[in-house]
Regions:
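Ferredoxin-reductase
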Residues: 2-87
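Reductase modules of NAD(P)H-dependent flavoproteins
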Residues: 2-3, 141, 148-258
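Short, Lys/Arg- and Gly-enriched loop/turn segments at beta-strand edges
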Residues: 46-53, 96-104
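Short helix-loop-beta connector
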Residues: 104-109, 211-212
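Conserved S-adenosyl-L-methionine
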Residues: 107, 132-138
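Conserved beta-strand elements of the Class I
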Residues: 110-113, 217
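Ser/Thr-glycine-rich phosphate-binding loops at phosphate-binding pockets of nucleotides
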Residues: 115-121
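Histidine-anchored nucleotide/phosphate-binding helix
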Residues: 121-133
C-alpha cells in the first residue's frame, strides 16, 4: 500500500440523513490540482476498501475535505457515515482527474454544472485564485432534490465573499445558482431545464451560453452528465477529447459509466 497513507478525521458534518462532509489531516507531501480526486477508504476485514472521492478542499488548504452520500447498504459509505473525529482513513497518494482548468480553452465565463455530490470538485475550484484570473464570471450551478441537500450554501453565500484573500474576487466574479426540484425554493427545476429554458440567464443577467466565449465543467450523476453534454454539444461546444487537450468543456472521465 505504498500509494496509500493514513489520515485522521478532524471533523464530520451531516447536512441531512443522506449527505455528509468529513475533514481529515493532509500529508504535507500530497499535491493535487483543484478538481482532482483521490482514492479513499477503510480497512474492512483486513483488506483496503477504496473508492474515488473528489477533493472538496482547495489545494492550498492544510486539510482535506470530502462530500459523500450515505448508502445504507453501500460497502464503504455505510461505514464512512459513522466516522467521528480521531478515526483513521486510508487516502491515496496519487490524485488524478480530468476536471481541471488547464484543459479548457481561454474564455470569458466559466459554468460549473453540478448535481448532488458533484459539487465537491467545484468547491476546490471556486477557492482557487487562478479560476478568477482566467474568467470574468464564474457561475456555479448546483442542482438537488431537497433544500437540505444544498451543501456548503452558507459557506458559498456568506463566508467565501468575506475571505481574507479571495473575498473581493468572489464578490466580483462568482455567481451561485442553487436549484431544487422537489421542494419550494427561489430557483426550481432540473439543471438542464433552467439552462434550456433560458431561465438561468434571465436570473443571472448573462447572455445564453455561447461556445465563442463560455466554458464549462460538469460533474454529477451519469444521467445528468449525458444530458448536459448533449445540451452543450447541440450548441456547438466541443469537449476536451482527452486529458492534456483543450476543449470548450470538461467532465470527470473516471466517473463516467462505461
Amino acid at each position: 500500500m505504498s500509494n496509500t497513507g493514513i489520515e485522521r478525521v478532524l471533523s464530520v458534518h451531516h447536512w441531512n440523513d443522506t449527505l455528509f462532509t468529513f475533514r481529515t489531516t493532509r500529508d504535507a507531501s500530497l499535491r493535487f490540482r483543484n478538481g482532482h480526486f483521490v482514492m479513499l477508504g477503510l480497512h474492512v476485514e483486513g483488506k483496503p476498501l477504496m473508492r474515488a472521492y473528489s477533493v472538496a478542499s482547495a489545494n492550498h488548504d492544510e486539510h482535506l475535505e470530502f462530500l459523500s452520500i450515505k448508502v445504507p447498504d453501500g460497502p464503504l459509505t455505510s461505514r464512512l457515515q459513522h466516522l467521528k473525529p480521531g478515526d483513521e482513513l486510508l487516502v491515496g497518494r496519487k490524485p488524478v482527474g480530468s476536471l481541471v482548468l488547464d484543459d479548457l480553452r481561454p474564455g470569458r465565463h466559466l459554468y460549473l454544472l453540478s448535481t448532488g455530490t458533484g459539487l465537491a470538485p467545484f468547491m476546490s475550484i471556486i477557492q482557487d485564485p487562478d479560476t478568477y484570473e482566467r474568467f470574468e464570471k464564474v457561475v456555479l450551478i448546483h442542482g438537488v432534490r431537497l433544500v437540505s441537500e444544498l451543501a456548503y450554501a452558507d459557506f458559498i453565500e456568506r463566508e467565501l465573499p468575506e475571505h481574507e484573500f479571495l473575498g473581493e474576487l468572489v464578490r466580483d466574479r462568482l455567481i451561485y445558482y442553487p436549484t431544487v426540484t422537489r421542494e419550494p425554493f427561489r430557483h426550481q427545476g432540473r439543471l438542464t431545464d433552467v439552462i434550456e429554458s433560458g431561465r438561468l440567464f434571465t436570473d443571472i443577467g448573462l447572455p445564453p451560453i455561447d461556445p465563442a466565449v463560455d466554458r464549462a465543467m460538469i460533474c454529477g450523476s451519469a444521467a445528468m452528465l449525458a444530458d448536459s453534454c448533449r445540451l452543450l454539444d447541440e450548441r456547438g461546444f466541443h469537449i476536451s477529447p482527452r486529458q492534456g487537450e483543450l476543449g470548450d468543456y470538461v467532465i470527470e472521465r473516471a466517473f463516467v459509466e462505461k
